[in-house]
Amino acid sequence: MRLSRYFLPVLKETPAEAQIVSHRLMLRAGMIKQASAGIYSWLPLGYKVLKRIERIVHEEQIRAGHIPMLMPTLQSADLWQKSGRFDAYGPEMLRLKDRHDRDMLYGPTNEEMITDMVGTFVTSYKSLPLTLYHIQWKFRDEVRPRFGVMRGREFLMKDGYNFDLTKEAALHAYNRHLVSYLRTYERMGLQAIPMRADSGPIGGDYTHEFLVLADTGESEVFYDAEITDLKFGDREIDYDDVAQCDAVLQEFTSRYARTDETHDEAEFAAIPGDRQRSARGIEVGQIFYFGTEYSEKLGAHVQNDEGERVPLHMGSHGIGVSRLLGAIIEASHDDKGIIWPEGVTPFHCGIVNLKQGDAEADAACEALETALENAGLEPLYDDRNERAGGKFATMDLIGLPWRITVGPRGLKNGVVELTSRRTGESEELTPDAAVARVAEVYAAHKPVNAAV
């Protein structure tokens, strides 16, 4: 992509309404534009990152054996009245009436709809286990939307729902989701710590929130410092293997890690003092097991192998897809701008032409652009007739992990400059070697399946 042909409305000044780093940088980098309080248009650069994140979520859900689908944003109130949540949910749920005066709502979550659907079509234990998920826009009428996409009123969520015959099978689904979430966040360059949490309006007996440590987090968290040394890495997991999934759960949840709602001072005090930590955290996902609470209310039963009709055991599992952009920026930035992890960057590499209009420099940049594209990468070539300092500032602001700088002086020696955004280190290489180096880095970030 040529920057001269791209829509990238960067801002030189920091908008006054932006209170935290991620909001400031997303506005300055031309990623979003506020449409109304807590509601944003996603401009091309922001939309590209959003789709990168969405793809990773899809890939890891499919790798875990979960099945994608899509449910509507507008829901009838009938099912919510059956579950008792239409009145209990509160004013954050947007209620409306259609032209026939029927109660409708803009769904903040989908437990009722998915339970009714599965109850209609799944009648035998032979159809189990089953996990369905979708990625869809939601709306919650926050009293005070703030912090950009971190606490907006409209947001993109992945919601998954498992249906199982027994509690034991449903708890395996819970563990399977925990494993897939750990892998999902690491692919995005994040360490998201699973913490015991409160179940809130969804309900349930078991729940963990996944939190990214950041000074701007809304939650106060308490944890054993040893947990920050844990990495999922590239280990292979058989998601059908109960023992393997349970072992990962034990590894990542056996140490103390809780949000303020479930914090226990006595248990925390038992941790050696040099390992006790308190911090702020950004919630980026949550998993729940809530048994037969919804299936009993909404009539989702199956016939078991003894011919008895029994309610399904269920869980609900969410990832804040749009919120993740803010969390990644909060965790990965400097005073110059964003530093995207390779897994979610909008473009894989920037190309900066130091002397636009110079025939040799122009030809070298075009050749680099073609070579990177032939390697399966998406470069962003800054071909504008601007001063070099302005081009570097733009590249630093939008945070592409790698930059290739091309100028007449280097070309005389047959080299270009490859720079890492994260470390700031530069190296002179031949153009072919620079392309090979960038391609090698991204080989570890290729799609793992066809996704959707």
From Swiss-Prot:
GO CC aspect terms: cytosol
EC code(s) of this entry: 6.1.1.15
The keyword Metal-binding appears for this protein: no
Biological process according to GO: prolyl-tRNA aminoacylation
Primary subcellular site in the record, as a coarse category: cytoplasm
Annotated Gene3D superfamilies: Anticodon-binding domain (3.40.50.800), Bira Bifunctional Protein, Domain 2 (3.30.930.10)
Protein name: Proline--tRNA ligase
Provenance organism: Jannaschia sp. (strain CCS1)
